[in-house]
């Protein structure tokens, strides 16, 4: 145990993360309060043992306070990836702008896991002057501040009520009763550490799971009557009637079936993610578009509600379309090449439309649609306006991203060049000349 503690301390010193030191400082404050409360109630015995723990707590407080203000890397040779997130003020501003969109957002927010879309819609344009201008953050400064956008006032009030009631219950029970057991002190300090993390660090599965587990164990221990911490209490549950036995069996079978179904669905999602990653790797390393299409298509079939797979599938078909166009420039297109071109275009458009149907507020889906139609401008009538509409929709969903406006400007240039090329052709019809003259003027 002591070896694990020393190793943990060394890791903290090497990483030197401010939020971790702050959480540890608060945890040691809680332990110091528990120690002082018990020391004032008991007679002065085991002085040496108690002094050792007092000095240990004081050392932990001093060390964590020291490293909270030491921001210089202690080991410059060890490189860590930068951990970047929006500031607290920026996250709160995005939250209030999201709530002001409509009445539903005011009470329940934009929905779980949608902060990335809120960030794209309401981020400060000044972020474009920084190196992270192209990064779309999936979470804000912390879990609690992110909830303001995703779950609204009802969500954040519920979480704050959970934290407040839990802390009041814990400290009221600890203050009224003796907490001689080391387990109770450790759980109280750990609970303070994890709940504070909700306010100063983005949410992740591990921290959330640990927070609820520690909170549940601590509540269970504190609400026991006079049983010792590691005591065993007998509880019995009996079903004396056939109907109760039948109902219990039915619930058990339902839960087992639900568990099996959940495992099956998660296994499919895992396989889909694995095949998708392999397909992208193959495309990057070998440039084999057909194999990539097969792999991404398999992922889209296994996880049909994931718009990312459909978007990447559309992009893969777009690469195939572009390769067919490049090959047709070298010679007169044969009927086979024309058929391949039509199939690739139809597949790209179909996958792109599927991605948009799955997630209409994803700007990347609309940008993919714009890039497909942009490629088809010289070849397919009406593709020009479709490209403009798609890029315009993308810019409305991510108004502070300059890339969408660059895409839109490039599209107008292609339209203008296409119109000029058609005007230069001797066999251009009067209707085509009139149509593309108007397009060129507007572009």
Predicted regions and their residues:
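Amphipathic alpha-helical repeat scaffolds of TPR domains
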Residues: 264-285, 297, 301-336, 358-378, ...
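Membrane-interface alpha helices of multi-pass inner-membrane proteins
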Residues: 3-16, 193-199
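A membrane-periplasm/extracellular boundary helix in multi-pass inner-membrane enzymes
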Residues: 9-24, 28-104, 112, 117-121, ...
């Amino acid at each position: 145990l002591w070896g694990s503690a020393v190793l943990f301390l060394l890791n903290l010193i090497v990483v030197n993360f401010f939020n971790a030191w702050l959480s540890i400082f608060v945890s040691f404050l809680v332990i110091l309060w528990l120690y002082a409360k018990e020391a004032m109630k008991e007679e002065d015995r085991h002085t040496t043992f108690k002094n050792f723990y007092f000095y240990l707590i004081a050392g932990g407080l001093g060390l964590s306070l020291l490293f909270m203000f030491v921001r210089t890397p202690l080991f410059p040779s060890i490189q860590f990836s930068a951990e970047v997130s929006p500031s607290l003020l920026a996250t709160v501003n995005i939250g209030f702008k999201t709530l002001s969109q409509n009445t539903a957002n005011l009470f329940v927010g934009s929905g779980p896991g949608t902060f990335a879309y809120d960030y794209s819609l309401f981020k400060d344009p000044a972020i474009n002057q920084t190196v992270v201008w192209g990064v779309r953050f999936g979470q804000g400064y912390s879990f609690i501040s992110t909830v303001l956008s995703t779950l609204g006032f009802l969500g954040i009030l519920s979480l704050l009520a959970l934290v407040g009631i839990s802390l009041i219950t814990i400290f009221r029970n600890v203050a009224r009763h003796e907490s001689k057991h080391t387990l109770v002190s450790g759980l109280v300090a750990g609970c303070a550490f994890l709940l504070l993390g909700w306010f100063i660090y983005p949410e992740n599965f591990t921290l959330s799971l640990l927070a609820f587990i520690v909170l549940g164990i601590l509540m269970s221990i504190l609400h026991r009557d006079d049983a010792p911490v590691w005591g065993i209490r007998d509880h019995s549950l009996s079903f004396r009637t056939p109907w109760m036995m039948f109902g219990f069996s039915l619930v058990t079978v339902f839960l087992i079936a639900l568990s099996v179904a959940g495992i099956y669905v998660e296994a499919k999602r895992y396989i889909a993610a694995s095949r998708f990653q392999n397909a992208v790797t193959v495309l990057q390393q070998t440039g084999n578009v057909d194999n990539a299409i097969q792999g991404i298509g398999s992922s889209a079939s296994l996880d049909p509600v994931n718009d990312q797979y459909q978007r990447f599938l559309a992009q893969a078909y777009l690469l195939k379309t572009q390769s067919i166009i490049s090959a047709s420039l070298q010679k007169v297109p044969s009927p086979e090449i024309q058929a391949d071109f039509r199939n690739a275009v139809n597949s790209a458009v179909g996958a792109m439309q599927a991605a948009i149907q799955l997630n209409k507020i994803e700007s990347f889906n609309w940008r993919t649609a714009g890039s497909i139609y942009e490629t088809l401008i010289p070849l397919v009538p009406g593709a020009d306006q479709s490209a403009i509409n798609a890029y315009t929709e993308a810019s409305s969903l991510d108004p502070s991203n300059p890339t969408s406006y660059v895409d839109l400007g490039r599209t107008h240039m292609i339209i203008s060049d296409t119109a000029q090329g058609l005007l230069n052709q001797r066999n251009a019809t009067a209707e085509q000349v009139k149509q593309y003259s108007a397009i060129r003027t507007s572009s």
